[in-house]
Amino acid sequence: MARILLLFLPGLVAVCAVHGIFMDRLASKKLCADDECVYTISLASAQEDYNAPDCRFINVKKGQQIYVYSKLVKENGAGEFWAGSVYGDGQDEMGVVGYFPRNLVKEQRVYQEATKEVPTTDIDFFCE
């Protein structure tokens, strides 16, 4: 039995590493500029550093610019989070979309209003 487990365990680890994991949902709805949440809502500036607690979030340094793509609808006393990606030259997080606390940033420029309320999906909280 132990041999079977030892043979099975590396395969399970490989599958998880290749496919990633689905994390808990932070909210059931989000606000977007369009139905598919692909258009940028705004450009925001980080007011302080933020270290991501897990793979759903992005690390942010004070002063970095962040493109905002969606805003989670706050539920039952949970934190208010937005999804976006860091903008800048040579940043490790550049191009990676993740969540960050709304109170961490100040919107500098609004491109489109976030008026479309859409349900979140499992892929919104997927980690590679």
From Swiss-Prot:
Pfam family, one: SH3_2
GO annotation, biological process: cartilage condensation; sensory perception of sound
Localization per record: Secreted
Secretion signal, residue range per the UniProt entry: 1-17
A single Gene Ontology CC term: extracellular region
Main location: secreted
Keywords: Disulfide bond, Secreted, SH3 domain, Signal
SH3 domain span: 39-110
Tissue: Highly expressed in cochlea.
Covalent S-S links between cysteines: 32-37, 55-127
Family label: Belongs to the MIA/OTOR family.
Name of the protein: Otoraplin
Gene source species: Homo sapiens (Human)
